[in-house]
Amino acid sequence: MTNLAEIILKRMKKISILLCALALVACGGHQATSPTLDEVFASRRSIRAYEAGKTISEAEVRELLTATQNAPSWANMQPSKYYVAIGEEKREAVLELIGGNKDRVINAPVFLVSTFETGKSGFFRGNPVDATGDLWGAYDNGLSNAYLILKARAMGFDTLIMGMRNADELRKLFEIPDNETILAVIALGYRAQDPNTPVHRPLDEIAKFY
């Protein structure tokens, strides 16, 4: 009985090892673990060349945008809005409206037009609370965009925030109301290659301790 138990135990171990190996292969040779926040920070880059032929689903974009709803905003005004070009017709139309970035993002499967509602963040009863005015809305939109690009990287996607765009034509294309300011178009896709790591300014140049 003892010998039989030992044989069964050895076979079970072999099966367990085999199953683990198969799971590792199924994950592309990597463990299926979520990246840490520091890993997301370190790997996120502004990507200017995207892999052709790869798609991103609407469900994935919805998950991505849900993360932006956790971004802080002035008095929880949540002024940020997104217009998603995921269908080929709209995607092609956006490509024609982003100036010199077209060739860089031509293979990105999704574009998100980022706007914010004016007269909300930084305002109280219709009046600006200080000289900053609607810049608070732009600030909040930047925070929302930051959540978006970091969540995108955590999901294995890459992004490029583009300020170069034809705002008037984008407004017509997506029927964006006049009370929204268009700040950027964000390309979403998969990097074609790993970019070089940029040189960052020394910490003591950007922070002062007292």
Residues of each region from the PLM?
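Positively charged n-region of N-terminal signal peptides that target proteins for export
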Residues: 2-15
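Acidic, surface-exposed loops and disordered segments
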Residues: 8, 27-210
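Sec-dependent N-terminal signal peptides
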Residues: 15-24
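N-terminal regions encompassing targeting/leader/pre-sequences
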Residues: 1, 24-27
